[in-house]
Design a protein with these regions (language model features):
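A short beta-strand motif characteristic of beta-propeller blades
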Residues: 2-6
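Conserved beta-propeller blade repeats
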Residues: 8-25, 59-62, 68-71, 123-125, ...
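A flexible loop/linker signature enriched in serine peptidases of the S9 family
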Residues: 9, 26-35, 116, 141
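Short acidic/polar mixed-charge low-complexity motifs
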Residues: 11, 31, 47-49, 78-80, ...
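An N-terminal hydrophobic leader/cap segment in hydrolases
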Residues: 27-73
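Cap/lid segment of the alpha/beta-hydrolase catalytic domain
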Residues: 55-181, 186-188, 215, 220-230
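Active-site-proximal cap/loop segments of hydrolase catalytic domains
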Residues: 139-334
Length: 334
């Protein structure tokens, strides 16, 4: 028998089942994550129950400041459909001058075969509550749109993911949702690679931020940890037969083409994308006189864990984008 269970709005993940009961992680759009107990051991006509067992703490953010995602479908490479979540600026205490469109931050997710989730992401809300629009791009290769879409990225990493991030920004500018003159892109890990490729091989963005991102595919193939040591064979091409492809798609080998300011944020204990990825790219860009910032964090690996590190990195990135894009910021209150 089946017992229907009324579920709250949001995503469910991390399912664990036993004895007619199910534990799931509940990920709503405007509230902290929670653990739900779903109990279906009831008479069929009564239905089941969903009980919240624990949640990730109180939300220290005014609900009125939470931007809700809009599902966006836009033309990607070669006319195929691509997907994203668009978050407009949201802060009831502030309004843009009449006729002014918001600056845009393009977010390129990691994986690279991960996905953009509509679940509450406080890093996205950090930007939208400060007057930025954010588009979280589910570029070709992202999970959640079927096998064919997922496999588009095979042998095409550094191409289709980049093209879709560029296309998302252009689309939002073309339909009048964002300011075409104030476009930035950011990403971490594989998303940092997509970010650096977008800045190197396209001239659309005015600034970028690479969080422990890849600059040199050849070095990544040599240096990364064992678990992902053959991952690039599928994403880029067989190693070492495709070495010229690796070099052609590595921002470090084409640093002369990158012409906008970039901020790099790196954990010094990172074993997945070692610090030399950021350090060699920073040196190459500084050698050509570009505006570059580099923040290295002791005791941080691949993905920052310490609250102080995350806060420092976000505030530095925000200040960097504001300077580059010519956005005035209010002085801190006493």
């Amino acid at each position: 028998t089946e017992a229907p269970i009324d579920l709250p709005e949001g995503e469910l993940a991390g399912v664990s089942c036993a004895d007619g009961r199910v534990l799931v992680q509940h990920l709503p759009e405007a509230a902290p994550a929670a653990i739900l107990l779903l109990d279906a051991i009831l008479p069929l006509d009564e239905g089941g129950t969903a009980t919240s067992l624990a949640h990730a703490g109180e939300l220290a953010l005014d609900p009125a400041c939470i931007a809700r995602p809009e599902h966006l479908v836009f033309p990607g490479e070669d006319g195929r459909q691509a997907f994203a979540l668009y978050y407009p600026p949201c802060n009831p205490d502030f309004a843009a001058p009449p006729g002014e469109l918001p600056p845009l931050v393009v977010r390129s997710h990691g994986g690279p075969t991960g996905r953009a989730s509509p679940a509450l992401n406080l890093q996205i809300q950090f930007w939208t509550s400060r007057g930025f629009a954010v588009v979280d791009v589910d570029y070709a290769g992202s999970t959640g749109y079927g096998r064919a879409y997922r496999q588009l990225l095979d042998r095409s990493w550094g191409l289709l993911d980049v093209a879709d991030c560029v296309a998302a920004a252009r689309h939002l500018a073309a339909i009048g949702r964002v300011d075409a003159a104030r476009l930035a892109i950011r990403g971490g890990s594989a998303g940092g690679y997509t970010t650096l490729c977008a800045l190197t091989f396209h001239d659309l963005f005015k600034a970028g931020a690479s969080w422990y991102g890849v600059a040199d595919l050849e070095a990544l193939q040599r240096d990364t940890h064992k678990f992902e040591s053959r991952y690039l064979d599928r994403l880029v091409g067989p190693w070492p037969d495709a070495i010229e492809v690796y070099r052609a798609r590595s921002p470090l080998h084409h640093a002369e083409r990158l012409s906008c300011p970039v901020i790099f944020l790196q954990g010094l204990d990172d074993r997945v994308v070692p610090p030399n990825q950021a350090e060699t790219m920073v040196a190459a860009l500084r050698a050509k006189g570009l505006t570059v910032e580099y923040l290295a964090f002791e005791g941080e690996g691949h993905g920052f864990r310490k609250a102080a590190t995350i806060e420092t990195a976000l505030l530095a990135e925000h200040a960097f984008f504001c300077r580059v894009l010519g956005i005035a910021t209010a002085p801190p209150e006493d």
